[in-house]
Amino acid sequence: MPCFSSNQLAEWTGGNWSAQPRGDINGFATDSRTLSPGQAFVALKTDRRDGHNFLGDALAGGAPAAIVSAARADVALPQLRVDDPLRALQTIGREHRRASGAHVVGITGSAGKTSTKNLLALLLGGPPGVIATGGNLNNFIGVPLTLARIEPGSTRFAVVEAGISERGEMRGLAGMIMPDSGVVTLVGPAHLEQLGSIDAIAGEKADLLRHVPSSGVVAFPHQAWTHEPFRDLAAHAIVALPADASAPADSERTRFVPFFLEHGDTHTEILLTGHAGARSFRMRRVSGGMGQNAALAILIASELGVCDEAIRTRLGDWQPAALRGEVRTVAGRLVYLDCYNANPASMRDAIEAFNALATSRAPAGAARLFVLGCMEELGPDSPRYHRELGRWLRLGTADRAIAIGSQAEALAAGLAESGKGSVTVAQDVEEVRDTVISFAGPVFVKGSRRYRLETLFPVEAGVAAH
């Protein structure tokens, strides 16, 4: 467990202690309700709440100290007064990472970064020698909290996820992470409302990899190579090359590794080819996009010294996180749940995976139900993206689709243009809950988190996950 001295924290942050901490500080928390023993409370101030109002709760919760911008004499909790608690937390995370000696892998992407982060952490050996971002704590608060968990002398690898929604954010995150290696899973339309264009997204994602030293390695898919910021990284890049693509003629400085995916009923085979010969790996069945991300994780793990035998063993232990490509059997029918987030690329990838599963597991011609929550933060082109998705889906005669949310009409219009099934428009899940629950065939559920689509199929006893 890491240990932070009061002198060290004061030096890093430029702060002053009201009194010495009540015990050892081994980490930090920004929510007084979730404090663990030894965690100092960071009193953040936001538009919705002021952490200084919860110093008493932090004291009652056993916090050894707090980091504040305005000390409160009425709370008998040692307080480190700084100009800005958030900036202080970020400085602590950065300086602790700098001194740690751990190999830090940074991961970002328009889709799949959390699942890839979890998989890579597993391939590198998992706890206690490997730490990874918890959940999706990938922002200016979550990243330093993750870095502060590195235990010098014990943590060999830290796999840190970086998520952005506005221009310039990646530079700040990468400056804290200081990645020794880096992975970008995908460049695609996500957070366009703030980022403005795919080119801007590519530049932001590549910014994480620019912070990797020349002695390190970066990995990304062939799709990202089409964007100039990624071609600028050619000298130390590994590019995953799908079976239907070929390496560009001007890529002699870059290592392109062809990969092939073969999907069975329950498993996906990943074949990597190259100068070292063919290498095959097996994992539970995943989508094509996740298969590509697995190839990237395998390539990075190999570069970091993990042998193929260990990778194969650990791949066998992997399973998707809840609501991220999760396959369940509910009342005898196939249910595909991918409700954490949605953008055009991840939508198509998940639908393709569901259709393949439904074809192999359901009777021929069985009706399918697509519950489609809208994709948020796509900017002024949002109606077009939704209409294009609907047009691409091509419902069968017996199929049904439910479009939920702000762009439901545009999505429904696209579905009507290309498909033959029936389409329902709704604003929230409660309008269609009975319809979904009573549907007898395979069900696909995906959309942005704000629509709470996961509430249609809460986890219950007797529900099987695959």
Language-model features and meaning:
Residues 441-462:
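Peripheral docking tails and interdomain loops at the edges
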Residues 107, 322-326, 450, 454-455:
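ATP-dependent carboxylate/acyl-activation modules
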Residues 1-91, 95, 391-392, 396-410:
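N-terminal leader/targeting and accessory segments in enzymes
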Residues 80-84, 422-432:
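Short acidic-hydrophobic, aromatic-tinged amphipathic segments that line or gate anion-handling sites
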Residues 47-49, 321-323, 340-420, 466:
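Active-site beta-alpha connecting loops in nucleotide-dependent enzymes
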